Amino acid sequence: MSTVTTPSAPKVGFVSLGCPKALVDSERILTQLRMEGYEVVATYEDADVVVVNTCGFIDTAKAESLEVIGEAIKENGKVIVTGCMGVDASVIRNVHPSVLSVTGPQQYEQVVNAVHDVVPPRKDHNPLIDLVPPQGVKLTPRHYAYLKISEGCNHSCSFCIIPSMRGKLVSRPVGDVLDEAKRLVKSGVKELLVISQDTSAYGVDVKYRTGFWDGQPVKTRMTELCQALGSMGVWVRLHYVYPYPHVDELIPLMAAGKILPYLDIPFQHASPKILKLMKRPAFEDKTLARIKNWREQCPDLIIRSTFIVGFPGETEEDFQYLLDWLTEAQLDRVGCFQYSPVEGAPANLLDAAIVPDDVKQDRWDRFMAHQQAISAARLQMKIGKEIEVLIDEVDDRGAVGRCFFDAPEIDGNVFIGLDDGSTVQPGDKIMCRVTDADEYDLWAEML
């Protein structure tokens, strides 16, 4: 008697680099491959082909991408490259000529077709037996997910090359966004992190046209989108918010508990001169007034931001202006980067003095020390307060979670001691009382 053997599923390795927006691209590619019967494996040696989703935002990210591509070639040999760095394929092929395919961001079908060329899907594959969840393959923990609402950006910040890599703003249909959010919530997601290159510009490209969701008209606009997301009973957190005037409309939704009182606004600098060189909004005095007004309307509001020090033309006076502005603004969560020139960025052509590396480092150190003192003082005010915590991890030492003012990966944590026999699991929301704080994290006891 002859034995019939069933061919094994083709295996794909996947490395996703860069920002949450790239992570969502990776999830979309992996979902399509899983629907076609591919198995996703965790090691190079087990894979029939490896896909590397690259980051090309700054030169250090490009260097990391090239290093990972080289590692994949060495360990596996069959490598497909996609993502932001793939916009200029020659940069990759000059270093790694053996890569099988190079595509740019959002070119999902081309990536999948490239995988087909290397290792075709099984002809007898039945997509009905794969059990790919309705929300697709997710690379985040089960209890939170990134919700990408648009691609591209209409701004021309002089330090950035995102528009050249991802194009102009293209908003997703509001009904599609809300359908995806609903599927994620149904699958157990407790927190939706709304992302794009410019979240607050959502709908500008389609003139805020009216779409439909659940049979009701909904404008393709940030405020209306947040109102709808706020009806789903989960945390809704906004990232990459450009400080347009209509952002003011979101504050009442936060005060009413519809969405989290958390704004991630990359101010980048405060000096009017540097903001002008960056081609960013240069109304720092009005920004301070807006922050004050926002906090009057929503006292719990948490503001996160990022800044660049050492930008061409930045003087000690400009830097001190930034420190003074931080003192006035009293931001809660802040990141800082030393300026790094990016190939193709307009800032490279500025007629402005280059800041020496040692001065950049000194200013970064001073910036971080200055902001740490502000952050520590603001977190000290949380001691004794009751907070709701979303649990991310549980081990024999206790639980690690986040409250409404902590985004995953980039902000602080809440550390909670647990009694023996505790049933707390990742994804649970529990009430706690804050007992201690430092400049980044909180410690709390379960109520």
Curated annotation (Swiss-Prot):
EC id: 2.8.4.4
Note on cofactor: Binds 2 [4Fe-4S] clusters. One cluster is coordinated with 3 cysteines and an exchangeable S-adenosyl-L-methionine.
Pfam families tied to this protein: Radical_SAM, TRAM_2, UPF0004
Keyword vocabulary terms for this entry: 4Fe-4S, Cytoplasm, Iron, Iron-sulfur, Metal-binding, S-adenosyl-L-methionine, Transferase
Cellular-component GO terms for this entry: cytosol
Domain MTTase N-terminal: residue ranges: 10-120
InterPro entries attached to this UniProt entry: Elp3/MiaA/NifB-like_rSAM, Methylthiotransferase, Methylthiotransferase_CS, Methylthiotransferase_N, Methylthiotransferase_N_sf, NA-bd_OB-fold, Ribosomal_uS12_MeSTrfase_RimO, rSAM
Binding site for [4Fe-4S] cluster 1: C19, C55, C84
GO MF, one annotated term: metal ion binding
One BP term from GO: tRNA modification
Domain Radical SAM core, residue spans: 139-377
Residues holding [4Fe-4S] cluster 2: C153, C157, C160
Cofactor annotation: [4Fe-4S] cluster
SMART domains: Elp3
Intracellular or extracellular location(s): Cytoplasm
Residue intervals of the TRAM domain: 380-447
Keyword Protein biosynthesis on entry: no
Primary location group: cytoplasm
Reaction(s) catalysed (UniProt annotation): L-aspartate(89)-[ribosomal protein uS12]-hydrogen + (sulfur carrier)-SH + AH2 + 2 S-adenosyl-L-methionine = 3-methylsulfanyl-L-aspartate(89)-[ribosomal protein uS12]-hydrogen + (sulfur carrier)-H + 5'-deoxyadenosine + L-methionine + A + S-adenosyl-L-homocysteine + 2 H(+)
Disulfide bond positions: none
Entry-linked PANTHER family: RIBOSOMAL PROTEIN S12 METHYLTHIOTRANSFERASE RIMO, RIBOSOMAL PROTEIN US12 METHYLTHIOTRANSFERASE RIMO
Cited function: Catalyzes the methylthiolation of an aspartic acid residue of ribosomal protein uS12.
Protein's name in the database: Ribosomal protein uS12 methylthiotransferase RimO
Lineage summary: Bacteria, Pseudomonadati, Pseudomonadota, Gammaproteobacteria, Pseudomonadales
